[in-house]
């Protein structure tokens, strides 16, 4: 019993057919880039003057606005100001308010 099965696939070309394809295909020199109808040639690399103009426009950094979130903090996420600082600050504010109210009376 043989386990060898010949593969008959029409997608693959035999060597003689491939040779014929290679002989009838135009070479890379014949293909070349043709200019467009408006007479301008194709430009593969950017023009250095465009690069200088682009850099001058990027002198300013864009404005980035970050809004604080009021949601729960995920584990491991750092928040500023730390919660301990906020608790201490609130306690100080409450003490100052109480002291000012006592002075007014």
UniProtKB/Swiss-Prot annotation:
<keyword id="KW-0597">Phosphoprotein</keyword>
<comment type="similarity">
    <text>Belongs to the LBH family.</text>
</comment>
<dbReference type="GO" id="GO:0043408">
    <property type="term" value="P:regulation of MAPK cascade"/>
</dbReference>
<dbReference type="InterPro" id="IPR013294">
    <property type="entry name" value="LBH"/>
</dbReference>
<dbReference type="GO" id="GO:0005737">
    <property type="term" value="C:cytoplasm"/>
</dbReference>
<keyword id="KW-0217">Developmental protein</keyword>
<dbReference type="GO" id="GO:0005634">
    <property type="term" value="C:nucleus"/>
</dbReference>
<dbReference type="InterPro" id="IPR042945">
    <property type="entry name" value="LBH_dom_prot"/>
</dbReference>
<feature type="domain" description="LBH">
    <location>
        <begin position="18"/>
        <end position="104"/>
    </location>
</feature>
<dbReference type="Pfam" id="PF15317">
    <property type="entry name" value="Lbh"/>
</dbReference>
<keyword id="KW-0539">Nucleus</keyword>
<keyword id="KW-0963">Cytoplasm</keyword>
<dbReference type="InterPro" id="IPR038990">
    <property type="entry name" value="LBH_dom"/>
</dbReference>
<comment type="function">
    <text>Transcriptional activator.</text>
</comment>
<keyword id="KW-0805">Transcription regulation</keyword>
<protein>
    <recommendedName>
        <fullName>Protein LBH</fullName>
    </recommendedName>
</protein>
<keyword id="KW-0804">Transcription</keyword>
<dbReference type="GO" id="GO:0032991">
    <property type="term" value="C:protein-containing complex"/>
</dbReference>
<dbReference type="GO" id="GO:0045893">
    <property type="term" value="P:positive regulation of DNA-templated transcription"/>
</dbReference>
<dbReference type="GO" id="GO:0045892">
    <property type="term" value="P:negative regulation of DNA-templated transcription"/>
</dbReference>
<feature type="modified residue" description="Phosphoserine">
    <location>
        <position position="63"/>
    </location>
</feature>
